[in-house]
């Protein structure tokens, strides 16, 4: 791979990493909120023991679980791109 191609790819990977890290911060914040909401709904369901409260808890927990999966996927994407970035940097150094 030519030096200019490696440099261009490094730039692309770096930009995507920046986007994913920002997305990860947002996902972390949203997950904290959704987890708190699910926990509150769980407590309300335990206290009230009504079908409606239980359904609200399940819905809130489902949203929190979905955000947790999204967060894990974004974190995995960041790790993968960091490895790619390391490999590209190694190639760039090896070409000198």
What does each model-identified segment do?
Residues 20-24, 63-84:
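Amphipathic alpha-helical coiled-coil segments
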Residues 1-17, 89-96:
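Short, charge-rich amphipathic alpha-helices with coiled-coil/heptad character
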Residues 47-70:
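Short, glycine/alanine-rich amphipathic alpha-helical segment
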Residues 11-22, 26-29:
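N-terminal acidic leader/helix
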Residues 3, 24-31, 75:
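Amphipathic, non-membrane alpha-helical segments in soluble helical-bundle scaffolds
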Residues 11, 29-33, 54-62, 78-84:
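Short, charged, amphipathic alpha-helical segments
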């Amino acid at each position: 791979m030519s030096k200019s191609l490696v440099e261009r790819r490094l730039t692309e990977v770096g930009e995507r990493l920046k986007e994913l890290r920002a997305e990860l911060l947002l996902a972390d914040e949203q997950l904290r909120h959704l987890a708190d909401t699910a926990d509150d709904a769980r407590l309300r369901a335990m206290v009230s023991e009504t079908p409606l409260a239980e359904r609200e808890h399940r819905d809130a927990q489902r949203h929190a679980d979905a955000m947790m999966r999204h967060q894990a996927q974004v974190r995995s994407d960041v790790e993968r791109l960091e490895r790619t970035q390391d490999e590209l940097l190694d190639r760039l150094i090896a070409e000198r």
